[in-house]
């Protein structure tokens, strides 16, 4: 296949919702990997959790990466669009609350609850919301590509995931240097807010064959 033929396939071989979903994924990955790049240092030095910071950051990632199989049940029930909006809404609140822990405005709340308890609660909230993203976007890619274009579709998806993973920490470094480490989390929260709006305006529930509905009983 020539470069011109490949470009033509990329340009015409996918439904609009495919590109919307992948654009949402790109910016979600920018927000996630940006916050992940500073999370342990932020919790240790800015919030003051010291040696507990690594444990909490590790637990956050473990929960985030282990829940999508269960989150798929929710996505099956409520659809991609509503699940994406819920995901970004939880991310928006979660990143904001994590960032609040390192700001003067949040000190009274964290001191009242206890820093560790507060951070653990908001990290788990954020992880639960984040678990919804992968079933939504992967499912959308599967439903908006044909058998012929599916391999290319997933290649584009993983390329954008990797691109977000590469650029996110670089942007986080600039925000940290210019504004402060806590504002990396606030920028991730703002990005998530914009993703809610983008999903509401541009994302359309993809058609395609309806598979067997999953339930929690079937998953476990």
Stretches with model-predicted labels:
Residues 37-53:
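Short amphipathic helix-loop junctions that connect adjacent transmembrane helices
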Residues 58-73:
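Central cavity-lining transmembrane alpha-helices of secondary-active solute carriers
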Residues 64, 151-176, 191-192:
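Glycine-rich segments within core transmembrane alpha-helices of 12-TM secondary carriers
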Residues 89-114:
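C-terminal ends and interior cores of transmembrane alpha-helices
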Residues 182-201:
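Symmetry-related core transmembrane helices of the 12-TM Major Facilitator Superfamily/SLC fold
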């Amino acid at each position: 296949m020539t470069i011109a033929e490949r470009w033509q396939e990329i340009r015409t071989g996918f439904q609009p919702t495919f590109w919307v979903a992948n654009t949402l994924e790109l910016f979600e990955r920018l927000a996630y990997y940006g916050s992940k790049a500073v999370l342990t240092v932020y919790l240790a030095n800015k919030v003051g959790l010291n040696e507990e910071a690594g444990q909490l950051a590790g637990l956050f990632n473990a929960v985030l990466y282990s829940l999508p199989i269960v989150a798929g049940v929710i996505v099956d029930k409520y659809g991609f669009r509503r699940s994406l909006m819920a995901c970004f809404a939880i991310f928006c609140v979660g990143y904001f609350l994590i960032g609040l822990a390192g700001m003067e405005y949040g000190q009274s709340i964290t001191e009242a609850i206890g820093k560790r308890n507060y951070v653990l609660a908001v990290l788990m909230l954020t992880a639960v919301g984040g678990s919804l993203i992968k079933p939504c976007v992967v499912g959308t890619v599967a439903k908006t590509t044909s058998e012929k274009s599916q391999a290319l579709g997933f290649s584009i998806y993983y390329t954008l995931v990797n691109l977000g993973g590469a650029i996110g920490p670089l942007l986080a470094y600039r925000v940290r240097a210019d504004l402060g480490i806590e504002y990396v989390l606030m920028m991730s929260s703002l990005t998530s807010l914009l993703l809610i709006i983008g999903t509401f305006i541009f994302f359309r529930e993809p058609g395609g064959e309806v598979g067997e509905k999953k339930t929690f009983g079937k998953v476990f």
